[in-house]
From Swiss-Prot:
Record's protein name: Undecaprenyl-diphosphatase
Pfam family, one: BacA
Catalytic activities: di-trans,octa-cis-undecaprenyl diphosphate + H2O = di-trans,octa-cis-undecaprenyl phosphate + phosphate + H(+)
Keywords: Antibiotic resistance, Cell inner membrane, Cell membrane, Cell shape, Cell wall biogenesis/degradation, Hydrolase, Membrane, Peptidoglycan synthesis, Transmembrane, Transmembrane helix
Length: 264
């Protein structure tokens, strides 16, 4: 059973790490490992839902623009100015489908999600961030929406592995394909929205179970904390982005992995 303190801490962990390229799922599992707390995966999805609300608020104007474009497209009243938004909508749709397929496959191997596996993935994420920060290589495929969507969907799907940062790997793949950082972050965060809502729809029956098995108050407290902390976290992330200091996250992940290996 989860208590109030655990709910608050898990909410803080989720709120901070969701928007930072350090893997929120990896940190949640790491924390639960040390306090010997076992929770159903649907609890993590509920926390992700709380932080997705932060994304919706942060990008509310952009989402409104995309929704308006989609309505005009449905009514066949689009114009040339809608072309960019239609491409983004198409890209997010392809990414969502591919991610869903990959994520469903990976979810069948949850027994692999051991502590050493998570730590190795932390290191991989740290390396990807360094490659992103210092622009190790770049190819220009951004105009081919289908290929970009498939590639980014595959990469985002790998983010289902705890320790592999979903935002980190999608931002990395977007920049490799020729997108600038601002566009890469936008695609990464907006593509998370349908993924989380899709996961909720697929596991909607399990939501009833967690409210029956776990404490209703503690579950919602954790989600509320994740939401509030997430508001501050997303602003911190974009501030560090503007200052071009993402490599700090690589240093953190390397240090965390080494420290945990040493003491465990």
């Amino acid at each position: 059973m989860i208590n109030i303190l655990n709910a608050i801490i898990l909410g803080i962990v989720q709120g901070i790490t969701e928007f930072l390229p350090v893997s929120s799922s990896g940190h949640l599992l790491l924390f639960r490992h040390f306090i010997h707390l076992k929770l159903p995966i649907i609890f993590d999805i509920y926390l992700h839902f709380a932080t997705v609300l932060v994304i919706i608020i942060y990008y509310r104007q952009r989402i409104s623009e995309l929704f308006s474009t989609f309505i005009r497209f449905s009514l066949r009243k689009t114009n040339k100015s809608d072309l960019t938004n239609l491409k983004l909508i198409s890209l997010i749709l392809i990414i969502t489908i591919v991610t869903g397929v990959v994520g469903t496959f990976i979810s069948k191997y949850e027994r692999m999600f051991t502590l050493p596996f998570i730590l190795i993935n932390f290191i991989i994420t740290g390396i990807l961030i360094l490659m992103l920060e210092f622009k190790f290589f770049k190819i220009d495929f951004k105009d081919n929406i289908l290929l970009v969507g498939i590639f980014m969907g595959l990469m985002q799907g790998l983010g289902a592995f705890p320790g592999i940062s979903r935002s980190g790997i999608t931002i990395f793949s977007a920049t490799v394909l020729g997108f600038n950082r601002k566009s890469a972050f936008e695609i990464s965060f907006l593509s998370l929205i349908p993924i989380v809502f899709g996961a909720i729809l697929l596991k909607h029956k399990e939501f009833y179970d967690i409210f029956m098995v776990l404490n209703f108050f503690e579950i919602n407290l954790g989600a509320l904390v994740a939401f509030v902390v997430g508001i501050f976290s997303i602003n911190l992330f974009f501030k560090m982005l503007n200052n071009k200091k993402l490599y700090y996250f690589s240093i953190y992940l390397f240090a965390l992995s080494i420290t945990v290996c040493y003491f465990v």
